[in-house]
Amino acid sequence: MWRGVPGCLRDIVQWQVALWSHSFVRTWGSCGKAMTEALSAQAEAAGGLKALVQPNGDAGSNTSGEPLLERLEPAAVGKQVPESGDQAQGGEGQLPSNGEQTPAPVADSGKRKKRRGATGERVVPPPKKRRTGVSFSDEHFAETTYYFEGGLRKVRPYYFDFQTYCKGRWVGRSLLHVFSTEFRSQPLSYYEAAVRAGRLHLNEEPVQDLSIVLKDNDFLRNTVHRHEPPVTAEPIHLLAENNDVVVIDKPSSIPVHPCGRFRHNTVIFILGKEHQLKELHPLHRLDRLTSGVLMFAKTAAVSEKIHEQVRDRQLEKEYVCRVAGEFPDKEVICKEPILVVSYKVGVCRVDPRGKPCETVFQRLSYNGRSSVVQCRPLTGRTHQIRVHLQFLGHPILNDPIYNSTAWGPSRGQGGHIPKTDEELLRDLVAEHQAKESLSMLDLCESDLTPGLIDSTAPSSELAKDSLEGLATAAQKIDGIAEAAPQHLDTPEKAAKADVTQETDPLCAECRVLRQDPLPQDLVMFLHALRYKGPDFEYVSPIPAWARDDWQED
């Protein structure tokens, strides 16, 4: 190959090969020690090149006159053939020019390196499954205790963590921006005090600065001092219990499961704490103000079996209610479709775009002012009975939503609503604000933020243990503009209060004395009387307001 080629040119070519090899090794150094040793052997062949090339300057210098070979690292040339004794003393790992030692190449261990961001970049850990299931354990039940006062079941205030992963619309925005635009129920001073108190965590690390920019998969946790509204002190009666199901007579005013501001004051928690009935599967649901038969399955298999019966229309549900006016004495069937106006407020209406529904009504009695009506829903839409009765012109007598003047002069009869959905919700909320009865809508002042109308958002996105609940539970109260007291200006003073105490220095709700709800605020005249299937039938006692001799106050 080299026959007829001058020796000097041959040496130059070999040197160029060694130089290219050096560049390759630096780029792909992780390929292993074997490759490095092979390239070093090749470089040894050009060991005397420096002395041959530099005198005539053909290839030993660049345009600046600096010898190229002097700038090569020993990892590229391997063992150099010594030109003099002082160069030979260093051996492998020596720089030819200054004698500084460079570590020899290290072979790849074969282990995958931990992902690191660029200098100064915040690395977000991968998401984790943080919930093992939907059931609640003794740890949850032990968060707080009940006490009873004035015919009400009350919950002692307690600390609670709202948790969520960063939502897509938050990515690239600072925490400060998110709080100031989406959680305006509290002033920024509250969140700043929460940072000082160690209440805000990002990926389980305390937030030090609200200016931190959120990334995808960021996990946020906010600790709040939680207050729950009172419910009736009426006990939950068991109608039946066996190896498959638990059946209760649910009192009015108690939600079935945690939602909004309610957690311990729910059927699920009361059954777990007071009856040791845990890991139950709700087979259907009742509105908070609705009373009557409520069924739970004890196993997933039983739950699936009964839900299959529901899909096959094998179950029969029967309700009783008291409605305004004289209901027709013949059977009435309503098939009007129902559309959700707002998941957050919990408002629906008849609309052609809604889901198909069917309810069968039959009057049972009339006392001259109101009627007791039997209701048999053949479908199971939200507020189906209440909306259909409103459409028929006979709303439930004390329905806080569908018997309201906010719907207009006809109160929604025949679907005539002379206002937009936005106007309807605004007027409905304003009416209850004036009566100081927002709790009838399962709202408080802190809920009255932009975005009240959210007809496209599923309710699960608005409630479950997430920062969405922050606007509900962070507690901004009427007339309180500053949620973070001035004496919390140091980390020591802002330290998290003892979890056993019922007051918290950051909590505005702790500084407000709220009136208890009146007895009439805890009841709606709608009762689930009977639940019947192919092999079971459960009936609850008829309430006092449904009797023929009942008279209005």
UniProtKB/Swiss-Prot annotation:
Residues 76-135 are annotated as: Disordered. The active site is at 287. One of its GO terms (biological process) is mRNA pseudouridine synthesis. The modification Phosphothreonine is found at residue 490. Keywords: Isomerase, mRNA processing, Phosphoprotein. It comes from the Eukaryota. Its EC number is 5.4.99.-. It is an enzyme of class 5 (isomerase). GO terms for molecular function: pseudouridine synthase activity; RNA binding. InterPro entries: PsdUridine_synth_cat_dom_sf, PsdUridine_synth_RluA-like_CS, PsdUridine_synth_RluC/D, PsdUridine_synth_RsuA/RluA, RluA_PseudoU_synthase. Belongs to the pseudouridine synthase RluA family. Pseudouridine synthase that catalyzes pseudouridylation of mRNAs. This is Pseudouridylate synthase RPUSD2.
